[in-house]
């Protein structure tokens, strides 16, 4: 975090112990990568992404989203929803709206969000996506936690069979 502040970029994601993602202007990110390598950190690399997501550079998008969200009639959640912008359970429709708005520029507290679920007694997690990225993060957060990764029809069928 100190390095991010030093090179004027934002912490975009706190994914797992030892994995932090920064976001900002390209020059700042390049300086952060060089600084990470110079500080002896295990890895620092630039990611090929389309924007400076979860950073203050997304403020105008956040403002536009806030205007749109004012028009949305959110229902009260019927099951627990965790906001990963502050790693807590949202408390209602207005809280969901505010969390969605803050998500645009706020840091993703993935590790803390998963710890919250683990502390609540959840033992099995299901990930949908082309690669088991979140399963890898969970292994760093708490080794041995069961994660079922679903990436295609076959893995979906296997997951359904496991829970049947």
Predicted regions and their residues:
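Acyltransferase/transacylase module recognition
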Residues: 73-164
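Alpha/beta catalytic cores of group-transfer enzymes, especially the acyltransferase/condensing modules
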Residues: 1-106
